Amino acid sequence: MTVVCKLGSSIVAAPDGSLREDVLDLVCAQVASLHGGGERVILVTSGAIARGMRLMGMEARPAAIDELQAASAVGQGDLFRSYESRLGADEVRAAQVLLTASDLQIRDHWLNARSTLTRLLDWRVTPVVNENDTTATDEITFGDNDFLAAQVAIMMEARLLVLLTDIAGLHTADPRQDSSAELISEVSDATEIADLEIGDGTSPFGLGGMRSKVAAAGMAGASGIETVICDGTAEGSLRDAVAGESVGTRFTA
């Protein structure tokens, strides 16, 4: 079975746009370990725009679509190489896969994307998926790839979707603003969290917040796929999520 793991901009890029090398080291080491244990892992990454902005010396996220697209074009290759080199050090081959919303809406495109991803997994290659921001339009505001990750999980009939962020999971309030916020370890029914004020806080470079992650978990759950939202900066969090250990917030399906 397949596991889809999504890394948000907040754990890929630091506030100044530099790559969070330590976090990428941590996550890629876990992916390599899972790969060695027979898991089929697909990575979905954000961060191309953030990386491009850093390389181009931009301090603020551009508002113009063409500038966002150009920044993504500058950053995407460098971002992929960051994954490729780390996975390659553990003898795991990586492949870059860029998708747009239309690839997941047009039947022929969807079938081709699924066939390609399936072949890569059969070859024991780890796909590194990102949205093709250079040709996308409205998709650039598509929730920091949370929905893309959910759709890839559905397409590949994954057993688990893991959304890695920079906080421990879904809380009763924003833990960065409320010290009394408590971690919600499991959600089995969306009505359980209907009354929560789920924030849209993001990194300076991303667009996805906890709200989009919860929505992505709901989308995956409707197709029978469990989702775990957890802290990607914590040692072993991805490994524990895949093993079914208590980590972050698990949305049962």
Question: Model-found features: residue ranges?
Answer:
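C-terminal catalytic "cap/lid" subdomain
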Residues: M1-A253
